[in-house]
Amino acid sequence: MPVQGSQRRLLGSLNSTPTATPHLGLAANQTGARCLEVSIPDGLFLSLGLVSLVENVLVVTAIAKNRNLHSPMYCFICCLALSDLLVSGSNMLETAVILLLEAGALAARAAVVQQLDNVIDVITCSSMLSSLCFLGAIAVDRYISIFYALRYHSIVTLPRARRAVAAIWVASVLFSMLFIAYYDHAAVLLCLVVFFLAMLVLMAVLYVHMLARACQHAQGIARLHKRQRPAHQSFGLKGAATLTILLGIFFLCWGPFFLHLTLIVLCPQHPTCSCIFKNFNLFLTLIICNAIIDPLIYAFRSQELRRTLKEVLLCSW
């Protein structure tokens, strides 16, 4: 969040997008070529962040309020919501400070602003890493609940879940501090990209295996009740569609940001890569959108959580 220059958002040292009036159009890159640039209006960015913030606060509140939701699965879901909350909140704070500085409504020394920028960047980066980790943890938890159903409660205990949560948070903070300190080292950026790909592969393998097991189970039930094959095919199509949506949203929302990091290492001066760098704010907006979608996929599908959430909202009124 530098006071001057072109850097506007999270991890300002990675962002080469110049401040511009919100638009969708052609912009000149460093070589004079024309390329597509999508600028996100500050109002839209803040609005999406606010929606995500409120949504995830409700999830955390509902899980904390209902003791029936104090299980390992909901522990991971709560931590995912907390991570998404921090992603949205830190980006909103950074954007608000930038706007206040640009408007002259906030006066601060460059050293103070730089320290604030470092703190916000660490919070944002650590919450991003923890969000990815908790998405993977939820996938592992669901996998164990399906393939080791009889031993699930002895394998995934609340103390073990809490230790896993603590390890994820500590590792996320430590690695984010290293990333902020050594952002200009290619190895650091590549480690982040490899981490993202590892989470993507982990989730894909686990969910595909779970889908295959569910299809086998449905086929067995169909044979037991002598149902016709189309019913089993319909179940398989619905499962495949759900899996495609889940992994597709994950890749669409997170992929562009990590593509950005990859291109910084591979082609920092190439005209085509420079065009992609100009859309850094768009990539951050997609991550905010993921923070909005996560509760819809992982939290609000629970009837117990929805009931608790309704009670929380009614009590607040």
From Swiss-Prot:
The stretches that face the Cytoplasmic side, renumbered to this chain, are 64-72, 141-163, 212-240, 301-317
Q: Which residues lie on this side of the membrane: Extracellular?
A: 1-37, 94-118, 184-191, 267-279
One Gene Ontology CC term in the entry = plasma membrane
Annotated GO MF terms: melanocyte-stimulating hormone receptor activity
Q: List localization entries.
A: Cell membrane
Regions crossing the membrane: 38-63, 73-93, 119-140, 164-183, 192-211, 241-266, 280-300
Identify the Gene3D superfamilies for this entry: Rhodopsin 7-helix transmembrane proteins (1.20.1070.10)
Record keywords, A-Z: Cell membrane, G-protein coupled receptor, Glycoprotein, Lipoprotein, Membrane, Palmitate, Receptor, Transducer, Transmembrane, Transmembrane helix
Cross-referenced CDD domains: 7tmA_MC1R
Cysteines paired by S-S bonds: none
Sugar-bearing residues?
A: 29
GO term, biological process aspect, one? adenylate cyclase-activating G protein-coupled receptor signaling pathway
Task: Report how it sits in the membrane.
Answer: Multi-pass membrane protein
Residues with lipidation of kind S-palmitoyl cysteine: 315
Main subcellular location of this protein, as a coarse class: membrane
One Pfam family name from the record?
7tm_1
**Assembly description:** Interacts with MGRN1, but does not undergo MGRN1-mediated ubiquitination; this interaction competes with GNAS-binding and thus inhibits agonist-induced cAMP production. Interacts with OPN3; the interaction results in a decrease in MC1R-mediated cAMP signaling and ultimately a decrease in melanin production in melanocytes.
Which family is this sequence assigned to? Answer: Belongs to the G-protein coupled receptor 1 family.
This molecule's function is given as: Receptor for MSH (alpha, beta and gamma) and ACTH. The activity of this receptor is mediated by G proteins which activate adenylate cyclase. Mediates melanogenesis, the production of eumelanin (black/brown) and phaeomelanin (red/yellow), via regulation of cAMP signaling in melanocytes.
Please state what the protein is called. Melanocyte-stimulating hormone receptor
In its UniProt entry, the species of origin is given as Erythrocebus patas
Lineage summary: Eukaryota, Metazoa, Chordata, Craniata, Vertebrata
